[in-house]
Amino acid sequence: ENRTCIDDWRSLGLGLFGVADALVAMKLKYGSEKANAFMGEVMKMMLLTALRSSCDRAKKLGTFGKYRWEATKQSPVMDLVKELDPELYEDIHQHGLRNGTLLAIAPTGTISLLMGSYSGGCEPLYKISYERTTHKMEDVHGRFRVYAHSVKDLLEYHNLPLNLTDEEIIERFPWIVESHEVPFDDRVKLQAVMQKYVDNSISSTVNLKHDATPEDIFQIYMDAWESGCKGITAFRDGCRRGNILGVDENAKADEK
């Protein structure tokens, strides 16, 4: 049954991580128009490259089992391809695709940490520096300090000490912004720009301050839906105990 499902669809989920770190390195503020335009170009290139590769493999190995051109051509993705790369569109028409789906932006929380504390998926920097909780690493008990990869690189490049406060770092590099400081409508706009070129969904969590209201959360979901996002999550700081990532040890949630 599993083999049949795989042959029927051959779904892939090509993605990325380190978006926030890349924007910091390029001096682009997360959520700004320039940052959104840049990420749109990145995702457009990823989509067209993935489609070209899948089409080339279909020429040699055949399409996925459930492939039907009549259904495929109705996809919004194919409307984009027809506009952006007419030659690729015709090749897909002639030869089909090897894979039913191609792109997906996963959270990559653990993967990005293991690769060097890069930012996860398309998320903004959670914190310039933060404490992470673990229960499985030997010789590390409970919580340990982690610096955003791009921030550490900036400090080392400018020969600045790692003991600068977060506020001092932001003052020196004003394009750096933490997730709680990114307006939620800017978060949704960036995700919508990327979603345009992603055939699967995007994992994205809007981190809200403790005083966020139900109306704020409602607006996030409405904006995401209206802009074409396939999914989004809202997390209010302090809404549950034992957060894996802690903003402030002294920050207390309501007991209500």
Each predicted region: which residue ranges?
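Poly-acidic low-complexity segments
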Residues: G18, K29, E70, L84, ...
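Internal maturation/activation junctions in enzymes
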Residues: E1-R3, D7, K29-T108, G116, ...
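Generic secondary-structure signature for well-ordered alpha-helical cores
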Residues: D21-V24, L28, K44-T63, K127, ...
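Residue-level recognition of conserved structural "scaffold" positions that shape functional pockets
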Residues: A20-A22, K34, G116, I128
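Core structural elements
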Residues: C5-K27, K189
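Catalytic alpha/beta core of large soluble enzyme barrels
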Residues: M78, D91-R98, L103-E255
